[in-house]
Curated annotation (Swiss-Prot):
Main location: cytoplasm
Taxonomic placement: Bacteria, Pseudomonadati, Pseudomonadota, Alphaproteobacteria, Sphingomonadales
Binding site for 1-deoxy-D-xylulose 5-phosphate: 161, 187-188, 209-210
Name of this chain's protein: Thiazole synthase
PANTHER family for the chain: THIAZOLE SYNTHASE
GO biological process: one example: thiamine diphosphate biosynthetic process
EC number, UniProt record: 2.8.1.10
Family annotation (InterPro entries): Aldolase_TIM, Thiazole_synthase_ThiG, ThiG
Pfam families according to UniProt: ThiG
Domain of life: Bacteria
SUPFAM superfamilies linked: ThiG-like (SSF110399)
CDD domains the UniProt entry points to: ThiG
């Protein structure tokens, strides 16, 4: 495909695969996976990744923020106040305003607390941030986030780190159909076919971390994910055949001996 870019908050990207920066053996492996994935955006947990302590290994020594768009996230935050404070620190440290917001409800499921998420979204927008928001696969709540100023909606495919794949494709499709901002599947992808399905549903992109980082060969899996995302997008643009209850022969018999 010649030009099939997508845009969020005025930023344009060619790659529809966003890669995380956690759970890798080391920063070198993380950097190799990011390169193999062809990613342009990497998401960074502000509370867990070293971005400022020069006496210790730093992510920026391996993944150059001048070459990649760093997307600070609020992983580990369980209320709006924590999340907003974390992103204020990120802006002070690196000037970032395009951010990924996630406010978790509990440690067992890491399911989003949508009341706190909406509250944090409203605060961040007022403070000049451009939040891409992790959320439940609820079309009504997704619309409320968009109305509150979210620049992208990021419904989960399944619980974070579960690798269960897309559990509710119907709701994801409803979110896509109603949205006027990009929709990205965030969380739950386990293998390449999951990523392909996300794009086949019409999602603009997909974000993943564990599916690559915990693969037996993370760099090879990153390559697989890149191909899957591209294939899924092409299939969506091509338009799949309709589903039928009964068979329809590929080779008609009319006119044959």
């Amino acid at each position: 495909m010649s030009d099939d870019s997508w845009s969020v908050a005025g930023h344009t990207f060619k790659s529809r695969l966003i890669v995380g920066t956690g759970k890798y053996k080391d920063y070198a492996q993380n950097a190799a996976a990011v390169k193999a994935a062809g990613a342009e955006i990497v998401t960074v947990a502000v509370r867990r990744v070293n971005l400022t302590d020069t006496s210790a290994p730093m992510l920026t020594d391996y993944i150059d923020p001048k070459e990649y768009c760093f997307l600070p996230n609020t992983a580990g935050c369980f209320n709006a106040e924590e999340a907003v404070r974390t992103l204020r620190l990120a802006r002070e440290a690196g000037g970032w305003t395009l951010v990924k917001l996630e406010v978790l409800g509990e440690a067992r499921t890491l399911y989003p607390d949508m009341v706190e998420t909406l509250k944090a979204t409203e605060i961040l927008v007022k403070e000049g941030f451009q939040p891409m928001v992790y959320c439940s696969d609820d079309p009504i709540m997704a619309k409320r986030l968009e109305d509150a100023g979210a620049v992208a909606i990021m419904p989960l495919g399944a619980p974070i780190g579960s690798g269960l794949g897309l559990q509710n494709p119907v709701m994801l499709r409803l979110i896509v159909e109603a949205a006027n901002v990009p929709v990205l599947v965030d969380a739950g992808v386990g293998t390449a076919s999951d990523a392909a399905v996300a794009l086949e549903l019409g999602c603009d992109a997909v974000l993943m971390n564990t599916a690559i980082a915990e693969a037996k060969n993370p760099v090879l899996m990153a390559q697989a994910m890149k191909s899957a995302v591209e294939a899924g997008r092409m299939a969506y643009l091509a338009g799949r055949m309709g589903k039928r209850m009964y068979a329809d022969p590929s080779s008609p018999l009319a006119g044959l001996i």
